[in-house]
């Protein structure tokens, strides 16, 4: 039988002939928690570590995943804590904890392992790092994963709602048509789970475009990076010159929040690589598709994204997936500094606003469902060239409506002030929408995107059965979403029917760059092999999205 005892110097294993110090601290199991949600579960040991160093008593609390006890490194809690060297000491430390943990009845809690909205026992709550927001919630019922709880809201709980609202107004007044549109996008990201539940999906990207040193990234970080980092680092920003896998893993951590990818710049030696990488990221987020890769399975489709750039995306397909905001001159440094000085109040407004939303959740959800149903009905009856941009402006107006409705209901503004602000914000959003339309039209004309392209040509071949998908081994469907086609077959049909003069490689590169191919998991090939024959595998849902985003010629084929 293994015997252990604790001493002021740590845990000691008592053998028949000798005693051995396992570690230099005494762990006490405070609780055992069984955390569970619909997707994941975890058993946690809640430990209190106590040790005496140079006559001073040191006490630290730590939670350990039951499955990874053997990997526990006490020095990560405090450099003075240590397990004695050697595998036997490590094994005996684990055995000591397990011998006590097995005799404790676990406390069951709901497991929160990501930011954003959660539903538990019919109640909706919102997780902002170490903070949970909801109506009459009992915090003891929830366990927040340490990877999430390590993020602390950088806010001031003692400031008044009036002060916090004024901080919001100061930010929105930094630059008309820029800081206000940016703020509405950040607030939209917090409301996105609610919008989705009401029947409206709003996956889109804010594209901040301006010259270098225009302070656009600083402005975006001020609006969206609301977690405290003791090192003073920006926790939600990653550079575009990082690897795609690194960017994808980073963005996946910010589910239902905003992350920043910075920046697409004009360096001629790297511009093409950066643009291709930016295209990959924006299509995953905007289209709600997961990039398959053997090295990562991170899902970024629920992350709201701000992309900063010195240059525009030069295709309607790419730019149409974003909400464009031009930064034509440097951001006013005096106003920016003023807002930075009161950023804790700004972030306190986010908390106040979310508390109001979740206290009135059912009523707001019901109202949104009615509004969205009317909008979607009207939208389906309307033919519009750039539908996504129209949806972006609509959802921005919806967010503005609820933002200032909160202020009115909390008596922060009068009814007349509410009407004035609402009218002014609608005009700002309409102006931004018009800039987007003008830019899209300009790009379409200059690049020839109003003409037929391979995506539209293939769409027409499928729609009018120019391609036989029933009896042709070179072209067939798998399920409802995947088109398998030999590249030679694709080249022959498109070149003949639409008078193109493109090579096989051109078509392969074209559809790969549009990010609508299903590639091999290692990403080395753009084709898939079946019975030693290689096929392009095209996702039809993404082909349709690609056509919809540049649909000016589709009417010609009806």
Language-model region placement:
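DNA transaction DNA-binding modules
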Residues: 124-159, 170-171, 267, 367-558
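Conserved glycine-centered beta->alpha loop in an early N-terminal alpha/beta scaffold
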Residues: 1-177, 223, 249-250, 254-257, ...
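Conserved catalytic/switch belt of AAA+ P-loop NTPases
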Residues: 275-294
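AAA+/P-loop NTPase substrate/partner-engagement loops
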Residues: 209, 219-272
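Phosphate-sensing "switch" segment of ASCE/P-loop ATPases
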Residues: 299-301, 317-416
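Structural recognition of the conserved hydrophobic beta-strand(s) that form the central parallel beta-sheet
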Residues: 260, 302-310, 324-326
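AAA+/SF3 P-loop NTPase mechanochemical coupling elements
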Residues: 252-254, 292-308
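P-loop NTPase catalytic core of nucleic-acid-dependent motor ATPases
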Residues: 140-233
